[in-house]
């Protein structure tokens, strides 16, 4: 009896936070991962722990040329991709009393443009993959505006729109698209968040739950609905 080959997945933002937790879960399940992050050391540590399962493709995903080269390296090593998980991104909080447009430029470049570069590099590989699946992360702040998240909300709304439009465009090509909205997860990116977080997920639990839901390939995976009462009164 032939064995089902392990899925080949490109995971961005794998050096820390949700990305690192997703990588841990996926590698433990036997998947083969192409891991991207700016910091190489965490990726090397995973490669040492899971020999033969990790393809190291670090780089600056805001640099379109570097992303093209990453795509070429994955193609040379594997020939195709079964999944792309777009997790890389940043979260910046802005005080409206000192609004700084350079912050939204940074957020858009790091989150929206980098995701677009990765999609461009991966689509030829996904078309050649086995039941291909594109997973993009867009924050729940697109549904629930919070203080100091104007820039994050605008960028993540763009991400969500891009992913949902791609779902329509890529369906005839056999590529499924899922938008993942994790909500509050216990990562360093929420340390500056000074609003109540009534349903703050532990990192490992969030990663396991996300992957369980993603396997079903729904259009959207949103963590448990927020208890709105926990947000009032808002801080002054």
Predicted segments, located by residue:
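Active-site helix of classical SDR
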Residues: 119, 155-156
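Conserved NAD(P)H cofactor-binding loop of Rossmann-fold oxidoreductase domains
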Residues: 87-93
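C-terminal helical subdomain
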Residues: 179-180, 195-232
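Substrate-binding pocket helix/loop in short-chain dehydrogenase/reductase
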Residues: 95-108
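Conserved glycine-rich Rossmann-like NAD(P)H-binding loop of the short-chain dehydrogenase/reductase
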Residues: 31-45
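Conserved glycine-rich cofactor-binding loop
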Residues: 13-16
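Residue(s) in the substrate-gating loop at a strand-loop-helix junction
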Residues: 139
């Amino acid at each position: 009896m032939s064995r089902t080959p392990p899925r080949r997945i490109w995971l961005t933002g794998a050096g820390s936070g949700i990305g690192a937790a997703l990588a841990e879960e996926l590698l433990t399940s036997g998947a083969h991962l192409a891991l991207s992050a700016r910091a190489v050391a965490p990726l090397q540590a995973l490669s040492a722990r899971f020999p033969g399962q990790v393809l190291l493709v670090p780089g600056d995903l805001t640099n379109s040329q570097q992303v093209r080269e990453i795509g070429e390296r994955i193609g040379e090593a594997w020939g195709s991709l079964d999944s792309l998980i777009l997790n890389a991104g940043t979260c910046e909080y802005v005080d409206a009393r000192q609004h700084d447009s350079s912050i939204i430029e940074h957020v858009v470049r790091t989150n929206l443009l980098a995701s677009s570069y990765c999609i461009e590099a991966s689509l030829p590989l996904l078309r050649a993959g086995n039941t291909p699946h594109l997973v993009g992360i867009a924050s729940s702040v697109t549904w629930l505006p919070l203080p100091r998240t104007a820039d994050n909300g605008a960028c993540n709304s763009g991400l969500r729109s891009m992913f949902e439009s791609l779902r329509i465009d890529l369906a005839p090509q056999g590529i499924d698209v899922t938008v993942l909205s994790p909500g509050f997860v216990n990562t360093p990116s929420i340390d500056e968040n000074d609003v109540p977080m009534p349903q703050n997920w532990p990192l490992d639990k969030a990663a396991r739950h996300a992957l369980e839901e993603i396997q079903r390939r729904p259009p959207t995976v949103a963590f448990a609905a927020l208890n709105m009462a926990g947000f009032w009164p808002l801080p002054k």
